[in-house]
């Protein structure tokens, strides 16, 4: 607003007033300047990520938690040697762990790129195509709704009122005979 002019209640012309505390970019007030410097600014695109809890919204709780016991089980009476069972457990667990790491190393970034593009396109289409189409449809359907309402009130309401009056005088007596 620098250079702007305004008129007070008596009609005097003034330039735009300068705030004593400055603005958010250049605060004149020392306390305000220190407060601005102390605040941490977080950007949604460069925020810190949690490297320990990588599923904070629990998206994969019941889908991907597959352990050895969930896949391989020996019923009572048909057991392999204990050493084979332990080696199978270790092989399964280590293979699953390292093969997942290998796949995520090879395909993690390309898949993140593909899914990022997909959700960007989906968001774009929703914002620029779907919502405007729905709003347009709702505006256009109001006209049809009014015509339909007039039709119902003109033709159907009198018909149903007449049928209702016809059947309103019907009386039913029920007697219980012993």
UniProtKB/Swiss-Prot annotation:
The keyword Phosphoprotein applies. Residues 105-125 dip into the membrane without crossing it. Residues 2-94 are annotated as: Required for homooligomerization. GO terms for molecular function: molecular adaptor activity; oxysterol binding; protein kinase binding; transmembrane transporter binding. Residues 2-104, 126-178 are cytoplasmic. Residues 131-142, 167-178 are annotated as: Interacts with SPRY1, SPRY2, SPRY3 and SPRY4. A lipid is attached at residues 133, 143, 156 (S-palmitoyl cysteine). Keywords: Acetylation, Cell membrane, Golgi apparatus, Isopeptide bond, Lipoprotein, Membrane, Palmitate, Phosphoprotein, Ubl conjugation. The modification N6-acetyllysine is found at residue 5. The modification N-acetylserine is found at residue 2. It is a peripheral membrane protein. Its main location: Golgi. It is found in: Golgi apparatus membrane; Cell membrane; Membrane, Caveola; Membrane raft. The modification Phosphoserine is found at residues 2, 9. GO terms for biological process: caveola assembly; cell differentiation; negative regulation of endothelial cell proliferation; receptor internalization; regulation of cytosolic calcium ion concentration; T cell costimulation. There is a cross-link at residues 5, 26, 30, 39, 47, 57 (Glycyl lysine isopeptide (Lys-Gly) (interchain with G-Cter in ubiquitin)). GO terms for cellular component: caveola; endosome; focal adhesion; Golgi membrane; membrane raft; perinuclear region of cytoplasm; sarcolemma. Phosphorylated at Tyr-14 by ABL1 in response to oxidative stress. Ubiquitinated. Undergo monoubiquitination and multi- and/or polyubiquitination. Monoubiquitination of N-terminal lysines promotes integration in a ternary complex with UBXN6 and VCP which promotes oligomeric CAV1 targeting to lysosomes for degradation. Ubiquitinated by ZNRF1; leading to degradation and modulation of the TLR4-mediated immune response. The modification Phosphotyrosine is found at residues 6, 14, 25. PANTHER family: CAVEOLIN, CAVEOLIN-1. Belongs to the caveolin family. May act as a scaffolding protein within caveolar membranes. Forms a stable heterooligomeric complex with CAV2 that targets to lipid rafts and drives caveolae formation. Mediates the recruitment of CAVIN proteins (CAVIN1/2/3/4) to the caveolae. Interacts directly with G-protein alpha subunits and can functionally regulate their activity. Involved in the costimulatory signal essential for T-cell receptor (TCR)-mediated T-cell activation. Its binding to DPP4 induces T-cell proliferation and NF-kappa-B activation in a T-cell receptor/CD3-dependent manner. Homooligomer. Interacts with GLIPR2. Interacts with NOSTRIN. Interacts with SNAP25 and STX1A. Interacts (via the N-terminus) with DPP4; the interaction is direct. Interacts with CTNNB1, CDH1 and JUP. Interacts with PACSIN2; this interaction induces membrane tubulation. Interacts with SLC7A9. Interacts with BMX and BTK. Interacts with TGFBR1. Interacts with CAVIN3 (via leucine-zipper domain) in a cholesterol-sensitive manner. Interacts with CAVIN1. Interacts with EHD2 in a cholesterol-dependent manner. This is Caveolin-1. It comes from Dasypus novemcinctus (Nine-banded armadillo).
């Amino acid at each position: 607003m620098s250079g702007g002019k305004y008129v007070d209640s008596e009609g005097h012309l003034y330039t735009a007033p300068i705030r004593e505390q400055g603005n958010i970019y250049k605060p004149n007030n020392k306390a305000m300047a220190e407060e601005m410097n102390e605040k941490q600014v977080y950007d949604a695109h460069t925020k810190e990520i949690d490297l320990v809890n990588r599923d904070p919204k629990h998206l994969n709780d019941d889908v991907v938690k597959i352990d050895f016991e969930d896949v391989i089980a020996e019923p009572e009476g048909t057991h392999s040697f204990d050493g084979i069972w332990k080696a199978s457990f270790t092989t399964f667990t280590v293979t699953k762990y390292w093969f997942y790491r290998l796949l995520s190393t090879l395909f993690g970034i390309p898949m993140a790129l593909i899914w990022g593009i997909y959700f960007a396109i989906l968001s774009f289409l929703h914002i620029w195509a779907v919502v405007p189409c729905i709003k347009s449809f709702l505006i256009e359907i109001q006209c049809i709704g009014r015509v339909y309402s007039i039709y119902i009130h003109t033709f159907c309401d009198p018909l149903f009122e007449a049928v209702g009056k016809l059947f309103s005088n019907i009386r039913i007596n029920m007697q219980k005979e012993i």
